[in-house]
């Protein structure tokens, strides 16, 4: 999506559709920062006074600027608390976002700038208490401000404390971004990219530094270069209050906030219970402070206005001021100007990459006018005011007037007319009288000048922050890539495991079906064999029975013939008796044969039943053998599959281990490369800073050398004047002495006396001339030596300071490198432990599964054998009941009936 083209409905809902240039009127610049400017304005529909923060999202880093705007708007929309700035809406106009908020008088840093002295402890407690309520609200919703400082703590007319500037805020806690203003940054924020995450306690640290700022007018380490301050904060002890005038309660509060270890640092909710903020204080302490500040600002602005008015009057009457008039004017107002301009204030800090509404913004209301409307020049200015576009502000810089477009798009245009410059300055101070504020006009102008002059330093810090965030994005991108690679790897392994499990299941199903088919086939074969066996026995028995019957018939005939022969030989027995005996014998023989036949049939039936029973037992035993073979085959198959699965899992573990080590090496290599790049950038920035400081000092010394002839000329003129005064005195003394000598000496000696006096005067003048020349030479030599010594001392001091800062940077980088190496060692050890533990778990799992498989094998075989044994035992018991005895020792006849 092209920035500013609101195609996404969710993003479009963040912005109002009205034209802000028509909706808001009377724009007046009241603050300036890296993002642009903050304006006082009035809602044309409701007459409500608001503050407007204009943020351009064109030019360099367009996408980043647009994302910052979206983040800040989303953040502000969800805030509903008395101690956070009230959000009024956001509008878009020509690649500029107009962020509209409630109007406040100014910031806590403005109080320091106006009064030029620290706040009272009771005032610091009141401001801190209000800020803590706002922080506790943010932290309770897992939000982090990340840029707490006096410039971002605003005050309203009724004395309400408001947290502002959420351009650096985080909607996630914990966070891990390098953002904020250097001097107020917590150590864990500075080390965020290197060591991990942080939470809302970073705001507690910043609040502690803010307390030092309010108590000492500057945050800790403010005399350092901003980059050096970062290195100092990251590795040195926490700062403390320097003066002994503060109470122990305040000192403990600051020390409590500035605990180096985040886990030992209190939360904002815990700090609300601290004695420092809970103790009694006047209800109007902030209202009175604001009123005193407003009065002081009014006096400063009136002083500036009167100066402009006087210059205007003199210029109108006499033309441009001469040098002496300017000197006189400067001497008249020098004290107030020096008092206004002797401090850079919190604006010396490097603005964060994210935009700020804090020290760069303050609010305005109505105020009394103190202009003298009777003067014709002021009437002229009043008339001219209507011709000045309300969307532009006038900024006086050096010898030109720059017309700055309020939207921040226009380029400065030099106006060569000095009269117009003076009128614009006077008009600027007159317009200031229309609203109440705790920020003086000179402070607003100075912020604009500093913003332009410190662009190089600000760009360096912005570039450093961009680099840190870019490094963090690279690490996150690599971590996500490696995570995706690991997820893909694990998914691949999981699919392979699932495929193996499915294949194993399919193989077992096939084996089960095969075994069922074999059992069914064996059952059919056994049934056929049994039937065949029975038929063979029956056929044989039938054959035996036929043979037996034929044998009986033959035997019957033989016996019959034998009896007949015996009867025929016995002649003594009557024929009838013979017949009876033959019949009886035949009956006995038939009866015997019938019994033998019945016995044979009984024996055949018993033989048939017993052999069929034995055959069934053999079939059952054979079936048992098949079942045993099947279960062994199934269990062997399962064991083979399990061994293949275990080999696959070991291979997976080794491939995962190799991937994990490779990924860790890749991540650590990138981290070390980024740290080397960061350290190289830090070193380059420090060297560039050193060169800039040396150039500035050299430029200053060159200016001093250029200025020295003028100074020497002035001092020479002063000595010359003293010489002239001495000459005049000596001339007067000479005349008085001459007159006296002429009066007291005879006339004839006058010529000699005059000659003597003339020679004496000439001698003394010659001595005086020699003294004059000597004084001039000594003065020039002394001044040259003094300048050389002063410049050499400044050079030595600068070299010492830069050397200390370089040593601080080297120590910081060494510490970061050591911490990173220690972190890498911990990560490697952690990975080794994880890999070792995972391998141990895998081996334990393999052992347990093999043991479970062996146990299953033993139990199933045992259960099968027990079941088969019970089945055989039951069969044998039934055979015994049937009267077959022990079938185990039964032998089949030679004919194999099976």
From Swiss-Prot:
It is found in: Cytoplasm; Cell membrane; Membrane raft; Lipid droplet. Residues 334-351 have a biased composition (Polar residues). Its main location: cytoplasm. Residues 24-277 form the Protein kinase domain. Its EC number is 2.7.11.1. ATP binds at residues 30-38, 53. It is a peripheral membrane protein. It is an enzyme of class 2 (transferase). Serine/threonine-protein kinase that acts as a regulator of the p38/MAPK14 stress-activated MAPK cascade and of the MAPK8/JNK cascade. In response to DNA damage, involved in the G2/M transition DNA damage checkpoint by activating the p38/MAPK14 stress-activated MAPK cascade, probably by mediating phosphorylation of upstream MAP2K3 and MAP2K6 kinases. Inhibits basal activity of the MAPK8/JNK cascade and diminishes its activation in response to epidermal growth factor (EGF). This is Serine/threonine-protein kinase TAO3. It comes from Pongo abelii.
């Amino acid at each position: 999506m092209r920035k500013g083209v609101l195609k996404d409905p969710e993003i479009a809902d963040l912005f109002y559709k009205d034209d802000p240039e028509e909706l808001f009127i009377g724009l007046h610049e009241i603050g300036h920062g890296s993002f642009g400017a903050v304006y006082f304005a009035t809602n044309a529909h409701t007459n409500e006074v608001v503050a407007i923060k204009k943020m351009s999202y064109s030019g360099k880093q367009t996408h980043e600027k647009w994302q910052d705007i979206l983040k800040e708007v989303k953040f502000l929309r969800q805030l509903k608390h008395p101690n956070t700035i009230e959000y009024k809406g956001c509008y878009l106009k020509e690649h500029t976002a107009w962020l509209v908020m409630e109007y406040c008088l100014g910031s806590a840093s403005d109080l320091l700038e106006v009064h030029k002295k620290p706040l009272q402890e009771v005032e610091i407690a009141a401001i801190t208490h209000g800020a803590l309520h706002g922080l506790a609200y943010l932290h309770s919703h897992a939000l982090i401000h990340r840029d707490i400082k006096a410039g971002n703590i605003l005050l309203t007319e009724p004395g309400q404390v408001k947290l502002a500037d959420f351009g650096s805020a985080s909607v996630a806690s914990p966070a891990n971004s390098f953002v904020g203003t250097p001097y107020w940054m917590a150590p864990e924020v500075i080390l965020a990219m290197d060591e991990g995450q942080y939470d809302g306690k970073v705001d507690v640290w910043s609040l502690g530094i803010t307390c030092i700022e309010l108590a000492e007018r500057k945050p800790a380490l403010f005399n350092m270069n901003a980059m050096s301050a970062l290195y100092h904060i990251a590795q040195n002890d926490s700062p403390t209050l320097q003066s002994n005038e503060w109470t122990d309660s305040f000192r403990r509060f600051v020390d409590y906030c500035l605990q180096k270890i985040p886990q030992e640092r209190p939360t904002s909710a815990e700090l609300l219970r601290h004695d420092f903020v809970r103790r009694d204080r006047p209800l109007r302490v902030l209202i009175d402070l604001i009123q005193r500040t407003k009065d002081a600002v009014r006096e400063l602005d009136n002083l500036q206005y009167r100066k402009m008015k006087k210059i205007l009057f003199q210029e109108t009457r006499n033309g441009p001021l001469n040098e002496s008039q300017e000197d006189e004017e400067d001497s008249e107002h020098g004290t107030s100007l020096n008092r206004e301009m002797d401090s850079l204030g919190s604006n010396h800090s490097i603005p964060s990459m994210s935009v700020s509404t804090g020290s760069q913004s303050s609010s305005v209301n109505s105020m009394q006018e103190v202009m003298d409307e009777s003067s014709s020049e002021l009437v002229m200015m009043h008339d001219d005011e209507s011709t000045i576009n309300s969307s532009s502000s006038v900024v006086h810089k050096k010898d030109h007037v720059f017309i700055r477009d309020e939207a921040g798009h226009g380029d400065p245009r030099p106006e060569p007319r000095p009269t117009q410059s003076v009128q614009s300055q006077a008009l600027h101070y007159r317009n200031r009288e229309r609203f109440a504020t705790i920020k003086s006009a000179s402070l607003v102008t100075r912020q604009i000048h500093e913003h332009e002059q410190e662009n190089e330093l600000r760009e360096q810090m912005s570039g450093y922050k961009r680099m840190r965030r870019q490094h963090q994005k690279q690490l996150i991108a690599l971590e996500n890539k490696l995570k995706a690679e690991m997820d893909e790897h694990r998914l691949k392994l999981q699919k392979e495991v699932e495929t193996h499990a499915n294949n194993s299941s399919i193989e077992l199903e096939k084996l089960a079906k095969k075994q069922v088919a074999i059992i069914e086939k064996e059952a059919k074969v056994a049934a056929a064999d049994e039937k065949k066996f029975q038929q063979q026995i029956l056929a044989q028995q039938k054959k035996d029975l036929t043979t037996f019957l034929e044998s009986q018939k033959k035997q019957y005939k033989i016996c019959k013939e034998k009896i007949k022969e015996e009867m025929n030989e016995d002649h003594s027995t009557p024929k009838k008796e013979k017949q009876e005996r033959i019949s009886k014998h035949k009956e006995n023989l038939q009866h015997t044969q019938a019994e033998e036949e019945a016995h044979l049939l009984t024996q055949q039936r018993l033989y048939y039943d017993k052999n069929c029973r034995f055959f069934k037992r053999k079939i059952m035993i054979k079936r048992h053998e098949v079942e045993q073979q099947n279960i062994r085959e199934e269990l062997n198959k399962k064991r083979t599959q399990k061994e293949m699965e275990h080999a696959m899992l070991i291979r997976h573990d080794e491939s995962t281990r190799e991937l994990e080590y490779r990924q860790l090496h890749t991540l650590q290599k990138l981290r070390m490369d980024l740290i080397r790049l960061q350290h190289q950038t830090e070193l380059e920035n420090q060297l560039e800073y050193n060169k800039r400081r040396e150039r500035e000092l050299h430029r200053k010394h060159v200016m001093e050398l250029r200025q020295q002839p003028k100074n020497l000329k002035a001092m020479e003129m002063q000595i010359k004047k003293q010489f002239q005064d001495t000459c005049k005195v000596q001339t007067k003394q000479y005349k008085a002495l001459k007159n006296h000598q002429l009066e007291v000496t005879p006339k004839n000696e006058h010529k000699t006396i005059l000659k003597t006096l003339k020679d004496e005067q000439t001698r003394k003048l010659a001595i005086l001339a020699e003294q004059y020349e000597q004084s001039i030479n000594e003065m020039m030599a002394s001044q040259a030596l003094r300048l050389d010594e002063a410049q050499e001392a400044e050079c030595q001091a600068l070299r010492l300071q830069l050397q200390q800062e370089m040593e601080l940077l080297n120590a910081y980088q060494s510490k970061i490198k050591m911490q990173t190496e220690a972190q890498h060692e911990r990560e490697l050890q952690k990975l080794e432990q994880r890999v070792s533990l995972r391998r141990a778990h895998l081996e334990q799992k393999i052992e347990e599964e093999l043991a479970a498989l062996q146990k299953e094998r033993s139990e199933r075989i045992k259960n099968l054998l027990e079941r088969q044994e019970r089945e055989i035992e039951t069969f044998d018991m039934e055979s015994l009941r049937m009267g077959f005895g022990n079938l185990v020792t039964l032998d089949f006849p030679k004919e194999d009936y099976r």
